[in-house]
Amino acid sequence: MIELDFEKTGGLLPAICQDAETGEVLMLAFMNKESWEKTLETGMATYWSRSRQELWTKGLTSGNVQKVKEIRVDCDDDTILLKVEQIGGAACHTGHRSCFHKLVEGDKLTVVGEPVFDPKEVYKK
């Protein structure tokens, strides 16, 4: 079993999610030991939701799942890089392909790119 340093950071490790083909950074989430093990077991990106305090397999609600193609770990064993196939087109809950869809321009943020889906329709909120 691969042992990562979950203790150093209070039980949660940052997990960077990147498109396996293009290299585009899709999102940053957090993994605890349980979500790490579930990701390894299932091949589907599973994170720890800090707001809901529960495991969160990406895309179960929206259909925008992340199939893990490769996993890398940093030199200190406390940061995870998931290279994924983003199925469904969008990684962000706002409907955008990437969570990094805000561009800093001087003293303001500008949204770049169009949403792939309408979150109101998908999440019924």
UniProtKB/Swiss-Prot annotation:
Pathway listed: Amino-acid biosynthesis; L-histidine biosynthesis; L-histidine from 5-phospho-alpha-D-ribose 1-diphosphate: step 3/9
Binding site for Zn(2+): C75, C92, C99
InterPro entries the record matches: PRA-CH (IPR026660), PRib_AMP_CycHydrolase_dom (IPR002496), PRib_AMP_CycHydrolase_sf (IPR038019)
Function of the protein: Catalyzes the hydrolysis of the adenine ring of phosphoribosyl-AMP.
Name by which UniProt lists this protein: Phosphoribosyl-AMP cyclohydrolase
Subunit structure: Homodimer.
One Pfam family, short name: PRA-CH
Gene3D superfamilies, per database record: 4.10.80.70, Phosphoribosyl-AMP cyclohydrolase
Cofactor: binding comment: Binds 1 Mg(2+) ion per subunit. Binds 1 zinc ion per subunit.
One BP annotation, GO: L-histidine biosynthetic process
This protein's UniProt keywords: Amino-acid biosynthesis, Cytoplasm, Histidine biosynthesis, Hydrolase, Magnesium, Metal-binding, Zinc
GO terms for cellular component: cytoplasm
NCBIfam families the UniProt entry points to: PRK00051.1
UniProt cofactor(s): Mg(2+); Zn(2+)
Source organism: Desulfatibacillum aliphaticivorans
Cellular localization per UniProt: Cytoplasm
Residues that hold Mg(2+) according to the record: D74, D76, D78
EC class: hydrolase
Catalytic activity: 1-(5-phospho-beta-D-ribosyl)-5'-AMP + H2O = 1-(5-phospho-beta-D-ribosyl)-5-[(5-phospho-beta-D-ribosylamino)methylideneamino]imidazole-4-carboxamide
EC number: 3.5.4.19
Family: Belongs to the PRA-CH family.
Signal peptide, first to last residue: none
